[in-house]
Amino acid sequence: MVAGLERISDGTISIGDRVVNDVPPKDRDIAMVFQNYALYPHMTVEKNLGFGLRRRHTPREDVRQRVDEMSEMLGLRDLLRRRPGQLSGGQRQRVAMGRALVREPEVFLLDEPLSNLDAKLRVQMRSELKRLHDRIGVTTIYVTHDQVEAITLGERIAVLSQGVLQQVGPPQDVYDHPANVFVAGFIGSPPMNLLKGNAASGRISVGEVELVDRQVPDGEVLVGIRPEGLHPVGEAFDGPVFEVSVEVVEPLGDEVLVHGSIEARAALGGREAEEAALLADGKRDRATITLRLPPEERPKPGSRLRVGMAQHKVRLFDAANGLAVQPR
């Protein structure tokens, strides 16, 4: 719709100060990069970079200058005489990016541009994309199923599910204050822990453990807490405590993920509220939970942990519709 390949059913799309609802795609000044590189295999890198400019009858000297600048910016100067078949995946991706950027468009559309790359190259290209965006300052819409890419690259992110906008905002705000349980489960790896709880007279509880005081409507709620919001505590700790049975420990070098269970009614593990009953089947008296701990803290599977909760990081959701519950 932004590119003009599909018509919108209502509202307006503006690029800068110009409404482009009825502007043909070729006149919208938009450049696109897709999951597949779509390079011309018979052309050199240099000719691929300058193809769009030549099609627009840009003066030859301007084409040469802009191709030189872009190849320098993307580290392609030594590859200008090569053809796409002689390049690595990361190099081809940079050529595809450069071919779009060299036009100096008003809007840059990226549709999963890193999904064909291996894990190491994706991390490298992610930092290059961030650096490139900071340098050129072009408005960029980046489509991805990878929430890490969304959080690290975006200044604002929009979370969609089945074509419906769930939440839009700065990455940290979406992470800290998800609008519903779908966002809570999608943004963050591991996802937010969701425990079935109860609100009564301003007090929130999970099973027999009383948590924060929040002035919210009475009834069933889902208590959300990120893995880093949980921490082992000693006997002297006077706040709410869960007894966690450690089941799986994942040492990741700079951190340790601990997966376990607590005695409570149910857990959602980042899924939508209506799935609670299904997930509780066969485990009705226990709830799954994940902690993120520093590397020096590595409990053994089968052990038990006393776990406290950072109360200011607790988020509440309506158990019926999954929407975030705001204090009255």
Question: Residue spans of the language-model regions?
Answer:
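Short flexible coil/turn linkers enriched for glycine and charged/polar residues
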Residues: 81, 188-193, 217, 252-254
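C-terminal boundary and immediately downstream tail of ABC-type ATPase nucleotide-binding domains
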Residues: 177-199, 224
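ABC ATPase nucleotide-binding domains
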Residues: 7, 23-182
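ATP-binding/catalytic-site motifs of ATP-hydrolyzing domains
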Residues: 12-14, 18-19, 164
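Helix-to-loop junction immediately C-terminal to a conserved catalytic motif
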Residues: 3
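Non-catalytic connector elements of ABC transporters
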Residues: 202-328
